UniProtKB/Swiss-Prot annotation:
GO cellular-component term (any): acrosomal vesicle
Residue spans crossing the bilayer: 393-412
Subunit field text: Found in a complex at least composed of MROH2B isoform 2, PRKACA isoform 2 and TCP11. Interacts with MROH2B isoform 2. Interacts with PRKACA isoform 2. Interacts with ODF1 (via leucine zipper motif).
Gene: Tcp11
Tissues/organs with expression: Testis-specific. Expressed in mature epididymal spermatozoa (at protein level).
Annotated organism of origin: Mus musculus
Source species taxonomy: Eukaryota, Metazoa, Chordata, Craniata, Vertebrata
Domain of life: Eukaryota
Protein name as it appears in the record: T-complex protein 11
């Protein structure tokens, strides 16, 4: 049986293949194989997918000779006797439930109930907000790692090991798993790859495998190697290393488990490419569709923008008469182009400044205030998520700032120590809103312990008893809303988000104010989400915002600013 490296070497050479291979590197997906369409995702995705400039990497290649597997079509075997997972580890179809909306001017929705129109608007709105890059760490319930943990617990794999080790062996669980793996392999193929589809269906013919299992001679190791070789043909360059690592696993159960996990990553690669391919179309259609639907509602309800007008009026008033706490805005500056501190100058006003202040106010919105802007109702769940994320970052940055002020500078110059402390703090502050005092007590204990261990491991001077007690007290005081450190950090994060809205995320990261440098990566993620949400909303409702802001900003102020319009 040829190993993975030999199998990969048998790929047919060609210009497109060479170009794809030469272009690999990092996490960038440059191969069309990373964008494999599936029948499950639908032919719409395949048609919408632009051809890769690198050409097809895999799929039109010859595979190694198959072993003694049977012939025949795909059939299901008898009911498995193995423990059934609560839900199969299948990734949902990207396009189902989120079709490209029709042009708003063609009247496809004319005569339908208003509830149906609102539902369609929300579906289009949600489809346009799909993240361009899904990752395992952000998909605890949708990633393969999460699926294996949730739906195929360790007792399944233990039971599979017991069955294969029995005399005679029981292959019922193995057959179920092979059937699942076969379906995933088929889902990674493009419709035109009929030859590979026929080969997979022939090599993993469930009826023939059931016959082998009944005779007690099902070769699980051989089938695993065949699946591994097929994965070499289908995976994106970024997954080559993971696939080749599986070659060194001799235990059949561990190998099957590894295969199942990597196949899930390959499906995620395909989902990401599909999202990236459809994103521009979804956004373009969404802006037109949402605006047309809102205008239709506005024609029937002339007072529909009352809450939106009040929201923007409050934002403009805040900028004209800023609070004393706004003096901290000067901490944000940038050497590239206009500095973020320029953004915070209260006069002259600009539409962009008022709108950015309005968006920031939504992150501190009183849940009992029912006068939520009508133009942002669909975005309210996402704004609440951003508010929660921003609040946790405020606590995290406050903890790091206080801890660093009591420690030797060399300790917080260690990325390993900072990362460890951040992970510990993040896990503890998840329940901060429900029990702040209790959470901060746990945080103070853990942080003090980590600081002591870090200082000792680096040969630095230990904290005195007095400093330790002071550190614990200041960390626990972060639980209070009026805590000075917490208030300053909160203001600076809000300023950073305002800078992101006006200047962009990258320019806003160039010169972070004190206390935020240790959470730069987390701020970049938060800023990108905030900008993505607010800019889409601005694209949809810019005509309405412009008309409202004309009544709030004098023409002289508008002319005095470069951002005179949205």
């Amino acid at each position: 049986m040829p190993d993975v490296k030999e199998r990969a070497a048998r790929k047919e050479p060609g210009a497109a293949e060479s170009a794809s291979r030469e272009s690999r590197g990092g996490n960038t997906r440059e191969s069309a194989s990373s964008a494999r369409g599936t029948d499950r995702v639908g032919s719409t995705v395949a048609r919408a997918r632009p051809p890769s400039p690198q050409g097809p990497r895999r799929g039109a290649v010859k595979t190694a000779p198959r072993g003694p597997v049977g012939h025949g079509g795909l059939r299901t075997g008898p009911t498995s006797r193995c423990p059934q997972p609560s839900a199969r580890a299948k990734l949902p179809s990207v396009t189902r439930g989120a079709p490209l909306p029709p042009s708003p001017g063609k009247g496809h929705l004319g005569g339908t109930p208003s509830s149906h129109r609102l539902g369609m608007t929300e579906r289009v709105h949600d489809a346009s907000k799909l993240d361009c890059q899904l990752e395992e760490r952000s998909l605890s319930s949708s990633s393969l790692k999460g699926k294996v943990k949730d739906t195929m617990p360790s007792d399944f794999w233990e039971h599979l090991n017991e069955q294969l080790s029995a005399v005679p062996p029981d292959f019922s669980c193995a057959l179920e798993l092979l059937k699942e793996i076969k379906e995933i392999l088929l889902s990674l193929l493009l419709p035109r790859q009929s030859r590979l589809k026929n080969e997979i269906e022939e090599a993993l013919d469930m009826e023939f495998l059931q016959q082998q299992a009944d005779r007690g001679d099902l070769n699980v190791s051989y089938l695993s190697k065949y699946i591994l070789n097929m994965m070499v043909l289908l995976c994106a360059p970024i997954r080559d290393e993971a696939v080749q690592r599986l070659e060194n696993i001799s235990d059949p159960v561990r190998l099957l488990r590894g295969i199942f996990q990597v196949l899930g990553q390959m499906k995620m690669d395909m989902v990401n490419y599909t999202i990236q391919s459809l994103q521009p179309q979804l956004q373009e259609h969404s802006v037109q569709f949402e605006r047309a639907q809102f205008q239709e509602r506005l024609n029937k309800e002339p007072r529909l923008l009352n809450h939106t007008t009040k929201w923007l009026t409050q934002a403009a008033t805040q900028l004209i008469a800023p609070s004393a706490s706004s003096s901290d805005l000067q901490d944000c500056s940038s050497s590239a182009g206009p500095s973020p501190s320029d953004v915070a100058v209260p006069e002259p006003l600009s539409p962009a400044m008022v709108l950015s202040q309005g968006f920031l106010n939504l992150l501190t919105w009183d849940p009992e205030n029912e006068e939520f802007p009508e133009t942002l109702v669909a975005d309210r769940p996402r704004l609440q998520e951003l508010e929660s994320q921003q609040s946790q970052l405020t606590i995290l940055a406050s903890v790091l700032l206080v801890a660093s002020s009591f420690s030797d500078s060399g300790l917080f110059s260690s990325p390993q120590f900072v990362d460890k402390l951040k992970q510990i703090t993040k896990s503890l502050v998840e329940d901060f809103n429900s029990r702040p005092e209790e959470v901060m007590q746990s945080v103070s204990e853990q942080v003090v312990e980590e600081v002591h261990q870090g200082l000792e491991s680096m040969g630095l001077a230990a904290l005195s008893s007095e400093n330790t007690a002071s550190l614990v007290g200041q960390l626990q005081n972060i639980a209070k809303k009026e805590n000075c450190v917490r208030s300053v950090i909160d203001q600076r994060i809000h300023l950073f988000l305002k800078c992101c809205f006006v200047l962009g995320v990258q320019r806003s990261l160039l010169d972070l104010p004190g206390g935020l440098t240790l959470i730069e990566a987390e701020l970049a993620e938060l800023g990108q989400k905030f900008v993505s949400l607010t800019h889409h909303n601005q694209q949809v409702f810019a005509p309405y915002y412009t008309e409202i802001l004309k009544t709030l900003i004098s023409p002289a102020q508008t002319l005095a600013t470069k951002g005179g319009s949205l």
